[in-house]
Amino acid sequence: MACLLETPIRMSVLSEVTASSRHYVDRLFDPDPQKVLQGVIDMKNAVIGNNKQKANLIVLGAVPRLLYLLQQETSSTELKTECAVVLGSLAMGTENNVKSLLDCHIIPALLQGLLSPDLKFIEACLRCLRTIFTSPVTPEELLYTDATVIPHLMALLSRSRYTQEYICQIFSHCCKGPDHQTILFNHGAVQNIAHLLTSPSYKVRMQALKCFSVLAFENPQVSMTLVNVLVDGELLPQIFVKMLQRDKPIEMQLTSAKCLTYMCRAGAIRTDDSCIVLKTLPCLVRMCSKERLLEERVEGAETLAYLIEPDVELQRIASITDHLIAMLADYFKYPSSVSAITDIKRLDHDLKHAHELRQAAFKLYASLGANDEDIRKKIIETETMMDRIVTGSSESSVKVRLAAVRCLHSLSRSVQQLRTSFQDHAVWKPLMKVLQNAPDEILVVASSMLCNLLLEFSPSKEPILESGAVELLCGLTQSENPALRVNGIWALMNMAFQAEQKIKADILRSLSTEQLFRLLSDSDMNVLMKTLGLLRNLLSTRPHIDKIMSTHGKQIMQAVTLILEGEHSIEVKEQTLCILANIADGTTAKELIMTNDDILQKIKYYMGHSHVKLQLAAMFCISNLTWNEEEGSQERQDKLRDMGIVDILHKLSQSADSNLCDKAKTALQQYLA
């Protein structure tokens, strides 16, 4: 909504507006300052809790006039303060109200007001700023535009408990990401806010706590600092632990648990520290019980999922705390009975947000089952859980779908479950549907899971192949998203492992040699490694090697040459030499190496390389080329001897590396046989 409306629109909009609303605005223009003040006070009383009145006054142009009065040097402090109060009340209406206030540049005006010496006016400006900055329509960046604002807010923290509460609330809402964390940290946020945790005001303690949770999130620098901060002779983590005791308000318990969780994940607190194992984790499990409110259960489960995600031991402890796995099953039966919730408004709210519970449960199940086979088994054996997760993967909410697919991905790491539950529930069917049409964030997880379902021992591999997976995966390799390219090629690599010639031919045909070579020159190392892995799996078993090299030999040899000449890692070059070793194992394919002096020189070079892995891979090539039971072995041996390969073999047979020594001796025996 614009700040001032054009004249032609006024009549249609104003038909809704009462004369009394216009009367309030007209009084703001009275030449008598006392009448203006009374007009603002009356306006304040009129708009409290009345959204329609707020909208009317905004349409009638009250905001620019209030801002003008607020900024006028001739206005009394009382008038300025009352203007700030009314503007704060208007901001508490709808999101459209906030947009209108932002369009009128309210933030610079209020920030200017903070330079006043009058505390009541400062508090009114801060209260209004707090309301505006906590609205989802306000860009956080507006707090950081002027570099003098943050230091001034830090200085105002000492003025009163209200300045402390509002400023901390503004910081916790406007601190989004590492850049904001760094700005606040560099301006002394930790030192300025730490002592507020012992404030006599609950609201101040709570807002300070929220500040620390957003400052510490994924931030090792802040987290490492927090660990050593003393407040009244007590370390900050000890204060957080006291705040998550059962006798404290739930909001405080949860936020303290978040602070400790984030500090732990940022590496500032060990995962086996008693404050995590005996305090934070049990507190978060408590938040998952059905006695808690929906929001608390969601936040508790999501924070716990984040805490235990990388640590097997914490996953095991959580899985046996308060029957957590069974407790999470209740997240899907919500609300359990309508009569249990007497507040109809609450019931309506919870029905609208029940999907958040499912999302949180899937996230926590995914973390619990990330590593341990027994935990995965427990999750899957929980009443109809596989059906619920499979259903979740096709829900309309993107967040629920993502969490459900993550959960399936976590469970798909189990060989046992791939062979049993995943087959019983034909998980591959909904997964293929998800892969047809989903946002990238879901595609990345779903394609990762497909990689697992395509492992050679998975019974789902056959039906997936029959349902057009090759084309789908080849399509993923052309994505602009590197994670999707990696997963597409990884799944093809798993598909090609010990596969029949027909499947390999399908992969090569669908992928096209052009795309294969594009992937071999991909800037992402993971893509390159998986493409080499695919090539290695395609070039296995002699008939397949000979067939593929007869049609694509020239291009493959060209790609191999480029990689061996390029600036690549040891791992990439090792994989490439292993591909050459596979080619050297072909019956007719090996001639492509023997007739390529450039490649032979490269193999010789890598036999003398300083890295043992590369020497070993080059040795495999030589062994396969000199194997004397095969036709033409004598000519090959002679050519390699002339190149000085035998001398290198003698040298390597004296190597301190036992592996290298054995391989060299085996190759030399081919010459003696």
Curated annotation (Swiss-Prot):
It comes from the Eukaryota. Component of the CTLH E3 ubiquitin-protein ligase complex that selectively accepts ubiquitin from UBE2H and mediates ubiquitination and subsequent proteasomal degradation of the transcription factor HBP1. Gene3D superfamilies: Leucine-rich Repeat Variant. It is found in: Nucleus; Cytoplasm. Identified in the CTLH complex that contains GID4, RANBP9 and/or RANBP10, MKLN1, MAEA, RMND5A (or alternatively its paralog RMND5B), GID8, ARMC8, WDR26 and YPEL5. Within this complex, MAEA, RMND5A (or alternatively its paralog RMND5B), GID8, WDR26, and RANBP9 and/or RANBP10 form the catalytic core, while GID4, MKLN1, ARMC8 and YPEL5 have ancillary roles. The modification Phosphoserine is found at S337, S512. ARM repeats lie at residues 51-92, 95-134, 138-176, 178-217, 224-265, 269-309, 313-352, 374-413, 416-455, 458-497, 501-540, 543-585, 588-627, 634-673. This is Armadillo repeat-containing protein 8. Its main location: nucleus. The modification N-acetylalanine is found at A2. InterPro entries: ARM-like, ARM-type_fold, Armadillo, ARMC8/Vid28. Keywords: Acetylation, Cytoplasm, Nucleus, Phosphoprotein, Repeat. SUPFAM superfamilies: ARM repeat. One of its GO terms (cellular component) is cytoplasm.
